[in-house]
From Swiss-Prot:
Present with 13000 molecules/cell in log phase SD medium. Transmembrane segments: none annotated. It holds the Pfam family RNA_pol_A_bac. This is DNA-directed RNA polymerases I and III subunit RPAC1. The modification N-acetylserine is found at residue 2. DNA-dependent RNA polymerases catalyze the transcription of DNA into RNA using the four ribonucleoside triphosphates as substrates. Common component of RNA polymerases I (Pol I) and III (Pol III) which synthesize ribosomal RNA precursors and small RNAs, such as 5S rRNA and tRNAs, respectively. RPC40 is part of the polymerase core and may function as a clamp element that moves to open and close the cleft. GO terms for cellular component: nucleoplasm; nucleus; RNA polymerase I complex; RNA polymerase III complex. PROSITE patterns: RNA_POL_D_30KD. The modification Phosphoserine is found at residue 17. InterPro entries: DNA-dir_RNA_pol_30-40kDasu_CS (IPR001514), DNA-dir_RNA_pol_insert (IPR011262), DNA-dir_RNA_pol_RpoA/D/Rpb3 (IPR011263), RBP11-like (IPR036603), RNAP_Rpo3/Rpb3/RPAC1 (IPR022842), RNAPI/III_AC40 (IPR033901), RNApol_insert_sf (IPR036643), Rpo3/RPB3_RNA_Pol_subunit (IPR050518). It comes from the Eukaryota. Gene3D superfamilies: DNA-directed RNA polymerase, insert domain, RNA polymerase, RBP11-like subunit.
Length: 335
C-alpha cells in the first residue's frame, strides 16, 4: 500500500499504517533492525543556538510523536520553584511575581544538578547539589539628573523597570567552583518582571530545582516542538501559460516554479507548501494535480527556551526513550 497520505478537496485518504506483520499475505512486514538502520535518515536543514529544523525519514509515527512528547514534557530543566519574599511594596502581588520568576528560562545545564528527594525532611531536602539560589534586590529612587520636562520613567527614576537580568546568582557551598565557568543567568535577560515607582522595592530569594514539563510548563525546555509530514505535489498534466501563473498563485511563494523556456509549471520546493488545498477549489486544476503527504517523512521544528541547544534537547529525548524501552524490556512483569 502507498506510503502517501492522500489530500483531497473534502477529505484525507490512506491515513492508516498497514506495514505491520499479518496485514497482507503477500508481504511479511516484519520489523528488522538492520533494515531500519539502512533506511533511516536524519537530514538537518537549519541549526542554531535556539532553533533547529531537521527531517526524520523512514520512521514510524509512534516514534516521531514519542520524541515530540518527550521533548515537551519529559526532558528536565531548571526553574524557580520556591520564592521567599522579604519585602515587596510594588503593585504586583507576591504570588504573581513568583509565578513570573518561575517562568523565566535559566541558562543552566540540568545535568549539573541532582533531583530533590521529596521523602527527606525540609531541613535536609535542599542542598548545593540540587538547588540554585537566585536573589532579587531592587529599589526605585528618583533620578536627580533627570532632564527637565521629561515624562519617561526610565529617565525620571532609577530602577523603574525590573528585568530578569536583575536576578543574581548566589553560589551555595561548592557551587562557586562547579559553576565557575558557567554562572547561572536568565536565558532572556530582557524579560520584564515588574515596574516600580520611587519608594517601592522588591527583596526576595528564589530556589530553583530540576523538574519536567509534565509537572509544570515552566520546566519545559522548549518553546515549541512540532513536526509535519513532507508535502507531495504531483502535476499529472502539463500546465502552461496563464494557467501556470494561476496555478502558481495557489501555493505559498517558492513552491511552484515556471520554466522560462516552455512556460510550464513545475514543483520547485514542495517542502514549503502548507497544504492549504487552495488549488483544489478550481475545476481547471481538478484533474491536473494530486496532493499528498509522505507518511514516514517527518519535518521537525524545535525551538529551545534557552537553557539548552535544540540538539541537546533532542539527544536527551532519544536517551529517555531508550531508557523507557530498556525498562520495559527488563521489567519483571514482562518476564
Amino acid at each position: 500500500m502507498s506510503n502517501i497520505v492522500g489530500i483531497e478537496y473534502n477529505r484525507v485518504t490512506n491515513t492508516t499504517s498497514t506495514d505491520f506483520p499479518g496485514f497482507s499475505k503477500d508481504a511479511e512486514n516484519e520489523w528488522n533492525v538492520e533494515k531500519f538502520k539502512k533506511d533511516f535518515e536524519v537530514n538537518i536543514s537549519s541549526l542554531d543556538a535556539r532553533e533547529a529544523n531537521f527531517d526524520l525519514i523512514n520512521i514510524d509515527t509512534s516514534i516521531a510523536n514519542a520524541f515530540r512528547r518527550i521533548m515537551i514534557s519529559e526532558v528536565p530543566s531548571v526553574a524557580a520553584e520556591y520564592v521567599y519574599f522579604f519585602n515587596n511594596t510594588s503593585v504586583i502581588q507576591d504570588e504573581v511575581l513568583a509565578h513570573r520568576i518561575g517562568l523565566v528560562p535559566l541558562k543552566v545545564d540540568p545535568d549539573m544538578l541532582t533531583w530533590v528527594d521529596s521523602n527527606l525532611p525540609d531541613d535536609e531536602k535542599f542542598t548545593d547539589e540540587n538547588t540554585i539560589v537566585l536573589s532579587l534586590n531592587v529599589k526605585c529612587t528618583r533620578n536627580p539628573d533627570a532632564p527637565k520636562g521629561s515624562t519617561d520613567p526610565k529617565e525620571l527614576y532609577n530602577n523603574a523597570h525590573v528585568y530578569a537580568r536583575d536576578l543574581k546568582f548566589e553560589p551555595q557551598g561548592r557551587q562557586s567552583t562547579t559553576f565557575a565557568d558557567c554562572p547561572v543567568v536568565p536565558a532572556d535577560p530582557d524579560i520584564l518582571l515588574a515596574k516600580l515607582r520611587p519608594g517601592q522595592e522588591i527583596s526576595l530569594k528564589a530556589h530553583c530545582i530540576l523538574g519536567i514539563g509534565g509537572d509544570h510548563a515552566k520546566f519545559s525546555p522548549v518553546s515549541t516542538a512540532s513536526y509535519r509530514l513532507l508535502p507531495q505535489i504531483n502535476i499529472l498534466q502539463p500546465i502552461k501559460g496563464e494557467s501556470a501563473r494561476r496555478f502558481q498563485k495557489c501555493f505559498p511563494p517558492g513552491v511552484i516554479g515556471i520554466d522560462e523556456g516552455s512556460d510550464e509549471a513545475y514543483v520547485k520546493d514542495a517542502r514549503k507548501d502548507t497544504v492549504s488545498r487552495e488549488v483544489l477549489r478550481y475545476e481547471e486544476f481538478a484533474d491536473k494535480v494530486k496532493l499528498g503527504r509522505v507518511r514516514n517523512h517527518f519535518i521537525f521544528n524545535v525551538e529551545s527556551a534557552g537553557a539548552m541547544t535544540p540538539e541537546e534537547i533532542f539527544f536527551k529525548s532519544v536517551r529517555i526513550l531508550k531508557n523507557k524501552a530498556e525498562y520495559l524490556k527488563n521489567c519483571p512483569i514482562t518476564q
